Amino acid sequence: RKNNVRVGLDIGSTTIKCVVLDEHDALLYSTYERHYSHILEKAQELLRRIDAEQLHGQKALLSISGSAGMGLADSCGVPFVQEVFSTRVAVKRFVPATDCVIELGGEDAKILFLTNGTEVRMNGSCAGGTGAFIDQMATLLKMGADEMNKAAENAQRTYTIASRCGVFAKSD
């Protein structure tokens, strides 16, 4: 029997994300971890864990995406999928009514408009409002990003912060 388990590895500037899907697109496993610039070591560790805990030695299809994934994909002979394309395919398959996707990376922010084709807008020249900025705010507040997210869910008031640059927002 042909195995159609697929592993998607997204390697960004600060984190590595992974999903394992079965032949029916059911999610078998997912993780979101920091790589602390040890991309190769973290990818190896993660793939070994997936093999041991999910695949149990069975073969799977692997694709890599992300801003830091191309070099690894090339060196390993693994297909590289551009991250905006992979996001569009996943959203179309799993949440087809979606019109707009906002993706905050470690060092950039992207907005994908999906109606009538795909339009992409990107803030790649400033880390304000990206994952790195959110991490800095969490550190200043002495909480993790997950804790910050939970606190935001229960917020009773919204505070205005600087809209011109993330650097100035730190003092607000």
Regions found by a protein language model. Name each.
Residues 1-24, 98-115:
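Gly/Thr-rich phosphate-binding beta-strand-loop-beta motif of the actin/hexokinase/Hsp70
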Residues 8-49, 124:
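Short glycine-rich, Thr/Ser-proximal phosphate-binding strand/loop in the N-terminal lobe
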Residues 13-22, 43-53, 59-71, 91, ...:
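N-terminal cofactor/phosphate-binding cores enriched in small/glycine residues
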Residues 23-25, 32-35, 53-85, 112-120:
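Short beta-strand-loop/turn "lid" adjacent to the catalytic site in phosphate-handling enzymes
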Residues 38-39, 116-157:
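Glycine-rich phosphate-binding loop plus the immediately following alpha-helix
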Residues 74, 91-97, 113-116, 140-142:
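Alpha-helix C-terminal capping segments
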Residues 83-94, 98-102:
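Active-site cofactor/substrate anionic-group-binding motifs, chiefly glycine-
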Residues 148-172:
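A mobile "lid/hinge" subdomain adjacent to the ATP/sugar-phosphate binding pocket shared
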